[in-house]
C-alpha cells in the first residue's frame, strides 16, 4: 500500500513521515512537498504546491491513502481555496481514501477565522471523497511553550477567558495520524486528538510556576488588549488575525475536550502538558 502525506515539510508532516517509517508492514511512504529534495531515507519525495493544483494531481497519482495537512497561509480565504483544490486533485488522481487534518471545535464561520478554512475543507471532503477520515486536533502543547516563555518574561499569563484546554503534543498527533493511515475501519470517522487533561488558565499558570520556580499568575484580558499587545509585538496582520482567532476559539471552549482517540489510534497514551513544558522551560535560556 502506498501512503502519501501532503504538506510533509512542516513540523507535523515530518513527524508523521517518521511515525509511518517506524511502523511494520512494508508501506511505501510518499512525502509531498514544495521541497522534495529535502526528503531523505526510505520515503519518496514528490513535488506538490497547494497554490499549483496541477502539481498536486500529478503528485497524488498512485497513492492509496493520502493525508492532507493544510498550509499555514494566513491570507483570508486562501487556505479554503487550497484545501478544496487539494481534495479535488486527490479525487482526480484516484486516491481511494483521503484523510484531512482539521481543528477541534470547527464550525461554520466567515473568513478570516481559521475555523472557516477547516470547515470548508471538511464539508468538501465529505461531499466528494470516495472514502474519508478527519482528524481534528487541539492546540499544540509546543505552541503553549512559546506562550509560557513570553508569560515568564512579562510576569503574567494572559487569556481572553478562564477556559480549560487539553493541549496535545505534536508527536501524539503524528502518531494518531499514522494510525489512521495504516489502519482499517476509519472510513467516515471524525476523531479528536487531545491531551489527557483539561487545565484552566490558573492551573496552567501554576504549572509553569511550579516547573520554573518563578511566580506567575493568570489574568483575563479583553480582545482589544490582546490585539494591541500583538500589534505592539510586531506581528504582521495575518499573524494577529491568526492568534486572535485561536484565542477566541479557546475562550469559547473549543479545546475544552478530552478524548481517548490518541491512544485508540496510536496505541499509546498522550503526554500530559507537564512533560512537554518541563524539558523546554527548564533549559538554561528560560
Question: Residue locations for each model-derived region?
Answer:
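Short loop/helix-cap segments at secondary-structure boundaries that form the rim of catalytic
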Residues: 35-43, 58
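Rossmann-fold cofactor-recognition segment
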Residues: 40-52
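Flexible coil/turn residues that form the inter-helical turn or adjacent wing/linker of helix-turn-helix
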Residues: 197, 255, 269
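Short linear loop/turn motifs
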Residues: 243-249, 276-280
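Amphipathic terminal alpha-helices
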Residues: 261, 269-286
Amino acid at each position: 500500500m502506498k501512503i502519501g502525506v501532503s504538506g510533509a515539510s512542516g513540523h507535523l508532516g515530518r513527524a508523521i513521515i517518521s511515525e509511518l517509517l517506524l511502523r511494520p508492514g512494508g508501506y511505501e511512504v510518499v512525502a509531498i512537498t514544495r521541497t522534495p529534495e529535502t526528503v531523505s531515507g526510505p520515503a519518496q519525495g514528490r513535488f506538490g504546491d497547494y497554490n499549483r493544483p496541477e502539481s498536486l494531481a500529478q503528485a497524488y497519482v498512485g497513492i492509496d491513502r493520502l493525508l492532507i495537512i493544510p498550509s499555514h497561509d494566513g491570507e483570508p480565504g486562501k487556505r479554503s481555496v487550497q484545501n478544496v483544490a487539494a481534495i479535488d486533485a486527490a479525487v482526480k488522481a484516484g486516491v481511494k481514501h483521503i484523510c484531512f487534518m482539521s481543528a477541534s471545535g470547527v464550525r461554520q464561520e466567515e473568513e478570516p477565522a481559521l475555523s472557516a478554512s477547516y470547515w470548508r475543507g471538511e464539508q468538501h471532503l465529505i461531499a466528494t471523497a470516495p472514502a474519508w477520515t478527519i482528524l481534528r486536533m487541539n492546540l499544540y502543547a509546543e505552541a503553549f511553550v512559546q506562550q509560557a516563555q513570553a508569560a515568564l518574561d512579562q510576569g503574567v499569563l494572559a487569556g481572553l477567558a478562564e477556559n480549560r484546554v487539553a493541549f496535545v503534543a505534536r508527536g501524539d498527533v503524528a502518531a494518531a495520524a499514522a494510525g489512521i493511515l495504516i489502519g482499517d475501519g476509519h472510513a467516515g470517522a471524525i476523531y479528536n486528538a487531545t491531551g489527557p487533561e483539561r487545565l484552566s488558565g490558573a492551573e496552567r499558570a501554576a504549572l509553569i510556576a511550579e516547573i520554573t520556580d518563578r511566580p506567575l499568575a493568570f489574568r483575563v484580558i479583553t480582545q482589544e488588549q490582546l490585539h494591541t499587545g500583538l500589534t505592539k509585538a510586531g506581528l504582521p496582520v495575518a499573524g494577529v488575525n491568526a492568534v486572535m482567532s485561536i484565542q477566541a476559539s479557546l475562550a469559547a471552549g473549543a479545546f475544552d475536550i478530552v478524548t481517548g482517540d490518541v491512544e485508540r489510534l496510536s496505541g499509546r497514551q498522550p503526554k500530559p502538558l507537564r512533560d512537554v513544558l518541563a524539558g523546554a522551560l527548564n533549559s538554561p535560556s528560560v
